[in-house]
Amino acid sequence: MIQFQRLHKSYSVDGRQIVALHPLDLRIGPGEVFGIIGHSGAGKSTLIRLINRLEEPSGGRLLIGDEDVTALDGQGLRALRRRIGMIFQHFNLLSSRTVAGNVAFPLELAGTPRAEIDARVAELLARVGLQEHANKYPAQLSGGQKQRVGIARALATRPQILLCDEATSALDPQTTASVLQLLAQINRELGLTIVLITHEMDVIRRVCDRVAVLDAGKLVETGPVTEVFLHPKHATTRRFVSEAEHVDEAELHRDFAAVGGRIVRLTFLGNGTYEPVLGRIARETGVDYNILSGRVDRIKDTPYGQLIVALTGGDQNAARAGFVAAGVQVEDLRV
């Protein structure tokens, strides 16, 4: 368990106090994949670097288990950092070392015997699919391969927590998907707690269990990804979701003016996503429908669908009640 208790961070610049992170309270459970999303300058990198004390807090407490991280120094802080791995946006590999040498580096610093290092490096390179690239140098690798080296290196000391600082931002979409699949596999197989920061809601949707949304250094929304993604409350969260779904809300509302009837947003979650609910209820209630927008996708392993439809004719109240009875979440956009 990682607990932030009124943790905050400020800087002094030319005599002015700059607040990077306002006091916040947050809990991240053991074994979770927890996402932190925000635009540039929102405070997300500051927050994640407070966990391993790469940033020093200005106040508040940070607990990992029962240990107060904010009170550690010297040997205690070094021991903490061995339990926390970290991967970076631009990989931070040593160009003069081979792939195997980069993965071995933290073990060498820890004084691990050579035979143990060699065995651990071989194990990790197999896990990330790079066993055939052990003797190559970073300049000979693709971006995705470099990030896999970064992941293997971060796992070398058998950490309990893995911090991912914009780990896919420098990668193309296909490579991003493969790296996210690898992180999800590591979470499942090793039970690691993963804290991932990003500015892309699609990354959150694919791999995270819960998410926190930061805006201008403030925690503005948090909860399960299914709830936050499908029913965003804060304006910043709604913008992230619209960007992920490639929806122009202003254009969509202009489309509303061109159609008549009652407009509703229908949200299907789980196996019900694939049930023919809309057609059945239309037949039962005599309602006609016009689909204005639609999407079927997955949030991590859970299928979901969202439709915005205009209902005309028939018994629209009965249709709405029928959707609710079928487990569909209904939001009235225009009655």
Swiss-Prot record:
GO molecular function: ABC-type D-methionine transporter activity; ATP binding; ATP hydrolysis activity
Domain ABC transporter: from-to ranges: 2-241
Disulfide bond sites: none
Pfam families, A to Z: ABC_tran, NIL
Cellular component terms per the entry's GO annotation: plasma membrane
Catalytically driven reaction(s): L-methionine(out) + ATP + H2O = L-methionine(in) + ADP + phosphate + H(+); D-methionine(out) + ATP + H2O = D-methionine(in) + ADP + phosphate + H(+)
Enzyme Commission (EC) number: 7.4.2.11
Subcellular location: Cell inner membrane
SMART domains: AAA (SM00382), NIL (SM00930)
Key words of the record: Amino-acid transport, ATP-binding, Cell inner membrane, Cell membrane, Membrane, Nucleotide-binding, Translocase, Transport
Annotated positions binding ATP: G38, H39, S40, G41, A42, G43, K44, S45
Origin: domain of life: Bacteria
Membrane topology: Peripheral membrane protein
Stated family: Belongs to the ABC transporter superfamily. Methionine importer (TC 3.A.1.24) family.
Protein task: Part of the ABC transporter complex MetNIQ involved in methionine import. Responsible for energy coupling to the transport system.
Subunit (UniProt): The complex is composed of two ATP-binding proteins (MetN), two transmembrane proteins (MetI) and a solute-binding protein (MetQ).
The protein's name in its UniProt record: Methionine import ATP-binding protein MetN
Organism for this UniProt entry: Xanthomonas euvesicatoria pv. vesicatoria (strain 85-10)
